[in-house]
Amino acid sequence: MSRCLIIINPVSGGGAARRYALDLQWKLSTLFETIEVKFTRGEGDATRFAKNACERGFDAVFCMGGDGTVNETVNGIAQGGFSCTFGFIPVGTVNDMSRALGIPQNPTQAIRRIDINETRTIDIGRCNDRYFCNNIAAGVIPKVVDEVTPKEKSI
């Protein structure tokens, strides 16, 4: 039986993830026999959910959120032994990784493009006990990113 976990960050993109959650669930239900949906409530949730899904033998983990949700989900899959296919729908402020991979920034278009038979390998790096898949930064950049308020993100 094929199983997929969907991790949704309900506050990503000013709440946009909630608006597209059912569309993603419907699309993935045409590709997997069982779909489980989990909503994040705070930091670390996506990592824990993804790790648990991999350890339970899920075939795929998809997330819907911004760069932080993508990063957390990748960390969970890595901690779970890289046993799941990873997919994501960008609904964040920057969506850096999706831009680098050529994934449409419009969530509806990104959902329509999902094809579980068309996957690609991405590189994963590790720094200390954290994994990263798109970039790593040190010094001023992460400090500035950490200090941006939700209100400033919407400007």
What are these regions (language model features)?
Residues D59-M64, G68-T69:
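A glycine-rich beta-strand to alpha-helix segment
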Residues M1-V61, N75-G76:
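ATP/NTP phosphate-donor binding region
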Residues N9, A46, D67, G125, ...:
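A residue-level signal for conserved active-site and pocket-lining positions in enzyme catalytic cores
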Residues L31, T40, Q79-I155:
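Catalytic core of DAGKc-family lipid kinases
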